[in-house]
Curated annotation (Swiss-Prot):
One Pfam entry name: Ribosomal_S15
UniProt xrefs under NCBIfam families: S15_bact
Organism: Fervidobacterium nodosum (strain ATCC 35602 / DSM 5306 / Rt17-B1)
InterPro entries documented for this protein: Ribosomal_uS15, Ribosomal_uS15_bac-type, uS15_NS1_RNA-bd_sf
Keyword line: Ribonucleoprotein, Ribosomal protein, RNA-binding, rRNA-binding
Annotated protein name in UniProt: Small ribosomal subunit protein uS15
GO terms for cellular component: cytosolic small ribosomal subunit
GO molecular function: rRNA binding; structural constituent of ribosome
Assembly, per entry: Part of the 30S ribosomal subunit. Forms a bridge to the 50S subunit in the 70S ribosome, contacting the 23S rRNA.
Annotated GO biological process: translation
Length: 84
């Protein structure tokens, strides 16, 4: 799935490209891609560190979204097949 498809699926209105939901969805796609890369290259520690930073950033955004809009938070977790 490319970036434009992800943005179209999670945007709130037509010109929305940077809302929290879109950012979380894009980060999730990058995290999944990098996870696959690390399965094939287990000693790539630089990429592993980048992955950890992305996971932390996504966690912070999810925490913010949970406070700001709990309903959207639940929908996003469902669509992205994340925890809880």
């Amino acid at each position: 799935m490319n970036k434009d498809d992800i943005i179209k699926e999670f945007q709130i209105h037509d010109t929305d490209t940077g809302s929290t939901a879109v950012q979380i969805a894009l980060l999730t796609a990058r995290i999944r891609h990098l996870t696959e890369h690390l399965k094939n290259h287990p000693k790539d520690f630089h990429s592993r560190r980048g992955l950890m930073k992305m996971v932390g950033r996504r966690r912070k955004m999810l925490k913010y979204l949970m406070k700001k809009d709990p309903e959207l938070y639940k929908q996003l977790l469902e669509k992205l097949s994340l925890r809880k």
